[in-house]
Curated annotation (Swiss-Prot):
Glycosylation site positions: 97, 209
Protein name per the record: GPI alpha-1,4-mannosyltransferase I, stabilizing subunit
GO biological process, one term: GPI anchor biosynthetic process
Organism: Rattus norvegicus (Rat)
InterPro entries cross-referenced by the UniProt entry: PIG-X/PBN1 (IPR013233), PIGX (IPR040039)
Length: 252
């Protein structure tokens, strides 16, 4: 009886040691594969000045990508309430082959001010950079929304979070196994209704978050602005009426 129990104990111990060795081997293999993976670097910046900006997104892969020609990159960006993207402008840009972006938010109001709007989502199919073999870039025009006037500070800060980086390749690459976190279903291309499984990629961002300052009005100027607006409205209406009575031709 004791010998049987001892034999079972030895078998259990051997199995445990085998599993631990396998786990350690897998962990070392995973660490080795990850160690050979170069980082995916994402950078986004605003171009132009004023209330109408261009958001430029650049993605650089390391040398572990052997052939990017078989891969497609999709950027899912979440536009904060302080900004908006014009879907009609996007349609015009798509027709001219300037960018490949489409709104995915169903309820969207272009005219809503910042405090009445909601976050919106945009899908941008990035294109390979002709000047960089391992680079993609995407372009998205954005516009400022109207903000409430402030009591003291004449500026407000808008924070643009980092986007989701999705990748789909016709063949497997080591980097996909290294940095893929999950799979996301999305259209294979802008002109296709076919759904592909995209890998949500982990990356390193140059900036933690992109920020931009928006000038806003001051509440202390409310009475002045209202008075001047009313005065100009009355003056222009009077001039229009005088011109109508002076140069207009009336017949009874």
């Amino acid at each position: 009886m004791a010998a049987s129990a001892l034999a079972w104990l030895l078998l259990w111990a051997a199995g445990l040691v085998g599993r631990l060795a396998a786990d350690i081997s897998d962990a070392r293999f995973s660490d080795g594969v990850r160690a050979t993976c170069s980082e995916i670097i994402l950078r986004q910046e605003f171009l132009k000045d004023g209330f109408h900006r261009d958001l430029l997104i650049k993605v650089k892969f390391g040398e572990s990508i052997e052939d990017l020609q078989t891969c497609r990159l999709l950027i899912k960006h979440y536009i904060p309430t302080g900004l908006f993207v014009d879907p009609y402008e996007l349609a015009s840009l798509r027709e001219r082959n300037i960018t490949e972006a489409v709104m995915v938010s169903e309820s969207f109001n272009l005219e809503a001010p910042n405090y009445l709007s909601t976050e919106s989502a945009v899908l941008i199919y990035a294109r390979q950079d002709a000047q960089c073999i391992d680079c993609f870039q995407a372009f998205l025009p954005v516009h400022y929304r109207y903000h409430r006037p402030h009591k003291k500070d004449g500026d407000t800060l808008i924070v643009v979070n980092n986007p989701d980086l999705l990748m789909h390749c016709d063949q497997e690459f080591p980097i996909l196994k290294c940095w893929a976190q999950s799979e996301v279903a999305a259209p294979c291309s802008l002109k296709s209704e076919e759904i592909c499984q995209w890998k949500n990629m982990q990356y390193k961002s140059i900036l933690k978050n992109l920020t931009v300052q928006v000038p806003v009005g001051l509440t202390i100027h409310t009475s002045l602005v209202c008075s001047v607006t009313l005065l100009i409205t009355v003056l222009c209406s009077t001039l229009i009426l005088l011109a109508v009575f002076k140069y207009g031709h009336f017949s009874l």
